[in-house]
């Protein structure tokens, strides 16, 4: 219980961008979709690697024997064995990247996995589910993954990066052409004490601007307050995430995207030996689940990558699925998807980018990553 309470408290220091990107500032209720187990026989290669020794033995026997009725029955039992996987994601880009997999899973098991998906409005809905073992895999803010790892003694591992930076500087007008143009300006922003603040401070400092003295940052509690401030300030400048930028532009035709903070971060990292990246979200797994069901985890990664690739290559169709699962409307999703930086990065590249990113946050505020940088076992490398 103490662990769970400390984790929930740590959420105050973790970014809620993933939920905020849902277009309503985290005020909508969680949408849940449950995929029921299919009773039909699945003949995928992943299913044939079923975890039970008894089932594996039956499958091997069936493959070796002639096609008698008993042998066929044994083969069907082995092939039909499924692993139940509970997945949670937040309204926003990380959930957007899953929609093709979610849609496929409604028809039955995918790659030997029987999925239950839950879309949550905020990260504080996800954390207790992971801690209590009710969720096996979850899409969470990148720094929250580190907080979870540190506060559960390594009971969470990161599988992949699924969202790069979604933060943008927007303005009424065209006075901001580079980061240096922000000097002396007022910036409306939300997310103080979490990733947006640390990312903005890093980019400003890297361009010779002191965040404490050279700019004025007016921190708001929600993205919607930033939009309201822009509407009443004809020279207003704000830091907003996608797809909230797209929603704001629909309300204010004069609003212009001035800077992509992901690109500005990359520019500062260009000469680094192992460049990091501005990250928004990752997908994590309970360590115990990964150890017990490695085939299921790897099958999920394969299916999730296919889903991300589909979403990025089929924007219109993906937008319809995004609306189907009540993440954002299809109209907003179709315009925002090209700027949401939905991706799939695993393995050593994931470790390099994420570890560098966490180090930047740690140097500003150790509590933002759970008090310490994660050890190598934090990174799931298959």
Question: What are these model-derived regions, one by one?
Answer:
Residues 66, 74-219, 236, 242, ...:
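Short, glycine-/small- and polar/acidic-enriched structural segments
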Residues 355-382:
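Conserved C-terminal helix/tail region of periplasmic/extracytoplasmic solute-binding proteins
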Residues 143-144, 225-321:
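Pocket-lining segment of extracytoplasmic ligand-binding domains
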Residues 18-31, 45:
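Bacterial lipoprotein signal-peptidase II cleavage site
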Residues 290-364:
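Secondary-structure end/capping motifs
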Residues 105-113, 263-276, 342-351:
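Short, solvent-exposed loop/beta-turn-alpha elements that line the ligand-binding surface or hinge
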Residues 31-77:
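Extracellular mucin-like PTS domains
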Residues 2-24:
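Sec-dependent N-terminal signal peptides of Gram-positive bacterial secreted proteins and lipoproteins
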């Amino acid at each position: 219980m103490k662990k769970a309470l400390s984790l929930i408290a740590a959420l105050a220091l973790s970014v809620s961008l993933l939920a905020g990107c849902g277009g309503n500032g985290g005020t909508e209720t969680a949408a849940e979709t449950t995929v029921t187990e299919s009773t039909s026989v699945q003949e995928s290669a992943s299913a044939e690697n079923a975890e039970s020794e008894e089932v594996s033995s039956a499958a091997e026997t069936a493959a070796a024997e002639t096609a008698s009725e008993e042998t066929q029955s044994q083969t069907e039992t082995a092939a039909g064995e499924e692993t139940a996987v509970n997945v949670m994601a937040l309204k926003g880009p990380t959930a957007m990247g899953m929609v093709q997999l979610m849609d496929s899973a409604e028809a039955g098991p995918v790659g030997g996995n029987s999925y239950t998906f839950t879309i949550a409005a905020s990260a504080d809905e996800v954390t207790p589910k992971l801690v209590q073992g009710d969720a096996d895999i979850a899409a969470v803010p990148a720094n929250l993954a580190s907080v979870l790892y540190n506060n559960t003694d390594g009971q969470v591992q990161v599988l992949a990066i699924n969202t790069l930076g979604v933060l943008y500087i927007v303005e009424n007008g065209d006075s901001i052409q580079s980061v240096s143009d922000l000097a002396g300006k007022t910036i409306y922003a939300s997310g103080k004490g979490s990733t947006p603040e640390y990312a903005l401070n890093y980019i400003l400092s890297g361009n010779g601007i002191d965040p404490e003295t050279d700019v004025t940052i007016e921190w708001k509690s929600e993205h919607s307050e930033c939009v309201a401030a822009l509407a009443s300030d004809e020279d207003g400048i704000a830091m907003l995430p996608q797809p909230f930028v797209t929603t704001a532009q629909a309300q204010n035709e004069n609003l212009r995207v001035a800077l992509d903070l992901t690109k500005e971060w990359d520019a500062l990292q260009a000469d680094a030996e192992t460049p990091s990246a501005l990250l928004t979200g990752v997908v994590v797994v309970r360590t115990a689940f990964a150890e017990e069901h490695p085939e299921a985890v790897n099958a999920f990664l394969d299916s999730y990558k296919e889903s991300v690739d589909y979403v990025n290559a089929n924007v219109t169709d993906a937008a319809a699925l995004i609306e189907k699962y009540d993440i954002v409307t299809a109209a907003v999703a179709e315009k925002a998807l090209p700027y949401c930086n939905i991706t799939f990065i695993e393995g050593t590249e994931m470790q390099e980018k994420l570890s560098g990113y966490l180090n930047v946050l740690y140097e500003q505020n150790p509590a933002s990553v759970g008090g310490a940088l994660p050890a190598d076992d934090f990174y799931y490398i298959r």
